[in-house]
Amino acid sequence: MRRAVSQAAALQGVTLAEDAVSSAAFLGSSNPGGSERVALFGAVAHYRYRLRVGPTEHDVVTLHRVVKEDGAWRPARSSRAVFMVHGDGWGFEAAFLSSVGSAYVPPEQSLAAYLAKEGVDVWGIDLRWAGVPEGTQDFRFMKNWTLETHATDVGVALGVARLMRLAGGNFLGNMHLLGWSRGAVVGYAYLNREALLPRALRQVDGFIPMDMAVRFGPRDAQQQAWACERFEALSDARREGRLEGGLLGPAPGMMLRAIGQLAASEPTAPSLLVEPDVFGPGTGRPTNRKLAVVAAGATSVLFAPLQPIVPGYHLLGSTPDAMGLPEQLTFTREGYLFEYGQRAAPYQSLNEVVETEAWACGLDVPYDDRLRHVKVPVLYVGAAGGVGRYGEHSVTLLGSRDVTVLDIRTLPEAARALDYGHADLFLADDARVRVWRPLLQWVRAH
C-alpha cells in the first residue's frame, strides 16, 4: 500500500514525506491486507482505506470502494469504474451511500450502492476537511488547503484506485470521475491539472459533473454578480482570520446536524436555532420540523443576506404552504432528510469556497487554463431546482465533443423553486429511475 501511494503521488508531481507514506495504511488490521470491509447487501461490500497525504494529523483522506465481490475480500472484476467526489457538508458515505443504515429506505437505495449492485466498481474520497473531528478549535492547519490541495488529493486517490484495480486483474476498462456540487469544482480543477500529463499517464476516461457551475454564461450576468458579492463577503471573513466555514458561516455542519437531530426528536417544538419571525413578520418561531423542511426546500434562506448560487436554489423539491414556504417534501422522504442532516461533517476549509466564488465571478484563477485540452466524454447532470441549466455553460469550457446533458425536471423553468433539488439527485424515491439509471447507461456506453 505504501508503494501504491508513493507511485500515485509521484504521478501527480507530489513527493510525500516518509512519515506520510508510512502512515498511508488501511484502516483497521483485521485481515492480512489491512483494509476495513463491511458487507452491505447481497454480494456488495464497502471498503475503506485511510491515506496520509501530508505532514499533520489532519492531512488525511479516506478512500472508499463499493463493489460486488466474488467472495469475502475478493472484489469482482469490472470493466467500468466511477470515482466520486462529494461537495460541501457531507462526505462520501452521507452523499453517495446514505441508504446504508437508514431507517427509511432499503440499503441499496443510494447511488454508490445502486451502481455497485449493477456491476460498476465504485470508488470515492472523503476530502481532508470531512475527517476533522467535532470539537476542533484551532484551524490553522486549514490555512493552505485550497482547490489545488483537494485536486491533488483526488489525483493521488485515483492513482491508488487504478493500481488496486490492476492488482485485482482489471487490466482493461474505464475510470470516470464524478463530482457533485463543489466536488464538481474539484473535478474541473483536477482535469485542468491532469491536462499537463502525457495522455498515457492521464487517469480519467470520462467526467460526470453533477449540478454545479464554475463559470456563468453571458445570459447569466446576474448570477456572476451574485458570485462576486459572495466572493467579497467570504474574502473579508478570510482577511479577518477565518480559515474554516463556508456560505453557512463557521462550523456549517454543526448547524445542519442540529437541524436534523431536533427535527427527528422534537418535531413540533419551537426551534431555538433561529430567531422569531425568521421567515417573515408575524411568522413566529418555526417548529423544528418546519425549520428542517424550509432549510431543504428553500435552502437560499440559509445564505441570507448573501444571494444563492442561482435563483430558487434548494436541496429538495417541495410543495408550499399558504405563505409560500415549503410545507411538504415532494420527492424525498422527510425522515430521510432528518437522517441526512445528522450525517453532516462538522467543519469545512474556507479557501476552496472563496476560490470557487472567484471562479464563478469571472476572476482569474489557476484552475481553467488547460480545460480546453480536456477531451474526455462528459455527462452533465443538472437538477432543475438546484443549479440545473446554469451549470451547462461550464461544460463548454472543456474541449470535449462527446457531451451529454441530463436535465432532471418535472416543472417549467419558471417554477424551478419547487422542482427537483440539488440533493434529490441522490435522496429522492424516484432518483433510481430519473437519475441513476440513465447515468449507468452512459457509464456502460463509455
Predicted feature residues:
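Alpha/beta-hydrolase fold nucleophile elbow
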Residues: 167-181
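Catalytic active-site module of serine/aspartate enzymes centered on a nucleophile-bearing elbow/loop
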Residues: 367, 404-446
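Conserved alpha/beta-hydrolase "acid-adjacent" motif
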Residues: 386-393
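N-terminal cap/lid segment of alpha/beta-hydrolase-fold proteins
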Residues: 21-77
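Short, surface-exposed "cap/lid" segments of acyl-processing enzymes
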Residues: 70-124
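Conserved hydrolase catalytic core segment
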Residues: 184-218
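Alpha/beta-hydrolase
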Residues: 222-377, 381-386
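Alpha/beta-hydrolase active-site loop
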Residues: 142-166
